[in-house]
Amino acid sequence: MSYSGIFAILLPYMAFAFLGGATNRLGITRGRPEKLILKFYINVLVPVLIVNYVVGNDALKDIGNVIAAPLVGFYGIVIGYIVSLATVKYFGIREKASAASFAFTVGIYNYGFISIPLTEHILGKSAVGLLLVHNIGIDTAYWSVGIGMLTGFSIKNMKALLKNPPLIAIFASLAVNFAIGGDVIPEWARKIMHPVVVAAIPIGIFVSGATLAENASALIKKGGWLVSFGAVLLRMFVIPALMVLTVMILPVSHELKMITAVQASMPAGMLSIVIVKYFGGDVETAAQTIFTTTIAGMFTIPLWIAFFMRVLS
């Protein structure tokens, strides 16, 4: 697919993020409404979306895919954390909390809101199911290694991971696939789920934009052009290249390689700022990282996806 074709797919979803930001700054979604939307998204919309894409997905009856996908996802996050921690001092960040916040936000990319619709448009519906299983590894790295960087490693973080509704939905859907096989969801249930699935991604992107706008003051207070430069350099260039170079030589399915190409191209995850804020990290550094990589991503995402897919093909 060409640069212009991928950009055309990406643009409406980015518009939802900016719309979410605008409603926050106008006071429409600020505070409690934003938190309610976020809770509804994580606990209801995402689990329904997962069941829709995973149950009955033939690609997920292959045990090789089910094992390899989370491992590749885990690696993609951990390599980002390692590269970020190893280079953070070159971007003017000296304090421990700021370094951890920088590495956390640079290392975790936007692995759901933007990558899911792009994957479906480019690779098809079955690839989305594999991507969601791939995200098990991302969630594991996020809540273990990532939160460990911010707070110290603990069993409590792993317990929080296991109580995560999207993760429960993935494991339950995979269990249905292997135990029963075939698409066990009746047509009438699919029709009920359809509007929920259609709404899930735009709502997720919308609330992400609102959350980022909520912390816009942190972005304004601290210039930090060197931090922004480092975030874009690592998240949008160095880490994607490492991820795709690695997956090129791994004995995994072509579909998983293509999914990695899409995921590697993503900017820093927007909701990471909520986690950094919750655990007492450096919100200013996190805001800069997310904002600058998201803006850069509007132009680099189509470029990288088109290039990576040509290389992997």
Predicted regions and their residues:
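Alpha-helical transmembrane segments of multi-pass small-molecule/ion transporters
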Residues: M1-S313
